[in-house]
A protein has these predicted regions:
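Basic, Gly/Ser/Thr-rich N-terminal segments that form RNA-phosphate-binding interfaces in CRISPR RAMP
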Residues: 1-272
């Protein structure tokens, strides 16, 4: 889709998505003053986890320094021709009494995604249902006695999430994906914010003394990670649509810290 960008030049835009296959630690590069020593990056206003565009662009470039890579991603002397936004959280997995886990989103996330897509010239159909308080629109697998029980929160089923699940599934997979169709839950903005603060993984890490195999002094720390199955959304902007091929050059990416212990494996989806 064309839009006017910068110096009135016609630009192309694409929406694409990242699905976490293992927990992801998009760190801030700073030690926190809270109990969690190494938190994930978050939006300042909402507190929702995100993957910074700089991290994503660096992984896509993957250390390449050839002229073609410099043209697309930039160099110290020139700006790259491919622009990426931060990858924002679209779906968050939360433990569910029925169906093992739910994939939750909220009206605020959907409204912001649609607003950004329209601003970038993308005309994509995405339902905008409303939900408040302790209500939920839910897939069949996560319902129990007309309720959805997420961790310690009981929500009353207002209706089905099928229409929304079909739309999101189409964006991500190009078809109806059964797991998403059965597990999608639209919760209120407040409930989504609550789980963004409390529903992430907190992992204790230690460093052992090689001789005694005991924890070294001061070598216990806690780090935060976005759980596996989470889905992030991102927009790409370029004058030449051929640059979008870089988004799918590899079907899987490793993003964030702790790669040596399996963190940060994501699958690239979409491209609409």
């Amino acid at each position: 889709m064309d839009l006017l960008y910068g110096g009135w030049e016609a630009m192309q835009t694409k929406a694409f998505f990242l699905q976490a296959l293992t927990p992801v630690h998009p760190g801030t590069g700073q030690v926190s003053g809270s109990v969690i020593d190494l938190p994930v990056a978050r939006e300042a206003a909402t507190g929702f986890p995100l993957i910074p565009a700089s991290s994503l662009k660096g992984v896509l470039r993957d250390g390449r320094t050839d002229e073609a890579a410099n043209k697309v991603f930039g160099s110290p002397e020139q700006m790259g021709e491919l622009t990426l936004t931060d990858a924002r959280l679209l779906l968050l997995p939360v433990r569910s009494y029925a169906g093992t886990f739910a994939l939750i989103t909220c009206p605020l996330v959907l409204q912001r995604w649609r607003r950004d897509a329209e601003a970038l010239g993308l005309s994509l159909e995405l339902p905008q249902p409303s939900i408040t308080g302790e209500e939920v629109l839910a897939g069949s697998a996560i319902q129990y006695n007309h309720q959805v029980i997420l961790e310690d929160i009981d929500l009353r089923v207002k209706g089905s999430s099928e229409a929304l699940a079909k739309a999101i599934s189409g964006l991500l997979f190009g078809k109806e994906e059964q797991g998403l169709m059965e597990r999608l839950a639209l919760v209120s903005n407040d409930v989504f914010s609550y789980f963004c603060q409390t529903g992430l993984e907190v992992i204790a890490r230690v460093r052992l003394e090689s001789a005694s195999k005991t924890v070294a002094s001061g070598a216990l720390w806690y780090e935060e990670a976005v759980p596996a199955e989470a889905v992030f959304s991102c927009f790409a902007i370029a004058k030449d649509a051929a640059h979008f091929a870089e988004l799918h050059r590899r079907p899987y990416l490793q993003i964030g810290g702790e790669a040596s212990v399996g963190r940060g494996l994501l699958r690239v989806l979409g491209g609409v």
